[in-house]
Amino acid sequence: ADYLTLGLRENGRNSTARILNFHLARNPEIAFLWNMADNYSNLLNPELSISCPFILTLTLVVEDQVKTHSEANLKYMDLEKKSKTSYAKWFPSVEKEAKEWGELRQRLGSGQSSVVSYFLNITAFCKDNNETALEVEQDILNSFRKNGFELISPRFNHMRNFLTCLPFMAGKGLFKQLKEAGVVQRAESFNVANLMPLVADNPLTPAGLLAPTYRNQLAFIDIFFRGMNNTNYNMAVCGTSGAGKTGLIQPLIRSVLDSGGFAVVFDMGDGYKSLCENMGGVYLDGETLRFNPFANITDIDQSAERVRDQLSVMASPNGNLDEVHEGLLLQAVRASWLAKENRARIDDVVDFLKNASDSEQYAGSPTIRSRLDEMIVLLDQYTANGTYGQYFNSDEPSLRDDAKMVVLELGGLEDRPSLLVAVMFSLIIYIENRMYRTPRNLKKLNVIDEGWRLLDFKNHKVGEFIEKGYRTARRHTGAYITITQNIVDFDSDKASSAARAAWGNSSYKIILRQSAKEFAKYNQLYPDQFQPLQRDMIGKFGAAKDQWFSSFLLQVENHSSWHRLFVDPLSRAMYSSDGPDFEFVQQKRKEGLSIHEAVWQLAWKKSGPEMASLEAWLEEHEKYRSVA
């Protein structure tokens, strides 16, 4: 009486599902097409959503225009007459009704509108037990009631309502039966059009990282897809600790590696170590990095300015060198290369500057000699016997072009800011050169995690260099993903020029959970950056660890969408950047386990019941597959 039972047979087993139907009891007071999806998946109140498979059906028939026009005329004349008698004193609403019917008859007479008979029904499918059915019923009734839609269950008539969701059934006498039962509503065509069950969520790309929308629609993220009106493939990600940044980015890295491309990750905190080892990548600690600015040069005319810029940033991280400094430095770079080519060192550059300072050429130019002496002092720390000489005068640089994945852990350099700036800029130059030298159909990815620390450059030259690199990477199928903990690190007056350049030149922007206090301050300073709905939505984002999924806002140029990312327990273990998880894996590695075995044990430790259910499901389906 209160439901239908559907019998199914799958893999040699019988199973049943329960079918529940609900239809509209009366016309809603107000309805908008853009708000219709909130009836079954409310953005701000996710608990007001339908959590089971369902079919929402709108069956409509446009009534005869002449008949409805005549009906409107009669109705208007009757109400208009009553409104001018004592009847209106007892029923004050009659004047409003007369006005509405008068306007309706004008629209009907001019052909601007029509009267439509319609039947709105929702058919839900759930497990065949009373407890689940009651939960589904309450979900549906409460979700629609939130927006002013009153639904009722068709007692003893579930089969009739169920048939309406099947194709071509309404025209075979079923709609007439619905009319006779009094469950068909009437409204103007405009109002009925606003009841259409449309979901406007964008599926984004045909394939890629699966990230369902908040409306529970399939959506995929592929930053290299060309159909999103994006001007580049770069992505900026910001979210507080525990928001799920690492779990979101690591699948993107895997997709690039699986396509045959390469990825380089700048990290602080060993967050990508497990993934690197699982994927057979190269893991390098910042303390062991070795560079040589002249190592990969083949044409000094094309590379001289790049090396000059690198040495300029190393000499003055805050960007205090002027054009004369840089002109002299360019001469030193060219002279060093012409003398020793790839065997040239920073010592050769400093020697050239010393000889120039002592030469007769600048004997009468104390200003020039002063600049030469300044650069000699600033670059001395990077010579072979200088404080940081071991990092920049290597015969065999640490970075090799044959590695598909390289993770560079730079946390050990954080307490030496000058060295960190020099290393970071050298790495960015290396990445850009590798992107340019490899085939353009090969996907390339550079991930800069903890960008608020790694991109904290005061030197405007670094910002300009990053902006240029971010803009030109698209031509070589390259992408930069920059990650910070707070949107202020990207988009505020406090952000460095490099961070602002990364934000401004990223077509993809992902906003995860934010610090409530910091986000409120940001919205006060920049009230036009986010709409009220977006602020409320971001404020409701939870921690990925607590809710078992990541919530985020994806912005691609002017398009915005809301997504959730669900990750299986094995991937969660591999992607985890939590301290205890990291120590667990490292301890298992010391005990002799492989990285795969260590991650497997961590997955069982963190998500035992989930892993057990997945294994049981796999064994069951493998058994039936072998029987078939």
What feature does the model see in each segment?
Residues 245:
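Conserved lysine of the Walker
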Residues 1-195:
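Extended, folded cores of ATP/NTP-driven motor/assembly subunits in large transport
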Residues 237:
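Hydrophobic anchor at the beta1->P-loop junction of P-loop NTPases
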Residues 248:
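Hydrophobic positions on the alpha1 helix immediately C-terminal to the Walker A/P-loop
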Residues 242:
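Walker A (P-loop) phosphate-binding loop of P-loop NTPases
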Residues 280-284, 496-511:
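A short helix-turn-beta junction within AAA+ P-loop NTPase domains corresponding to the substrate/partner-engaging
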Residues 46-49, 61, 65-67, 162-219, ...:
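P-loop NTPase motor domains
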Residues 254-264, 279:
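Post-Walker A helix-loop "phosphate-sensing" segment adjacent to the P-loop in P-loop NTPases
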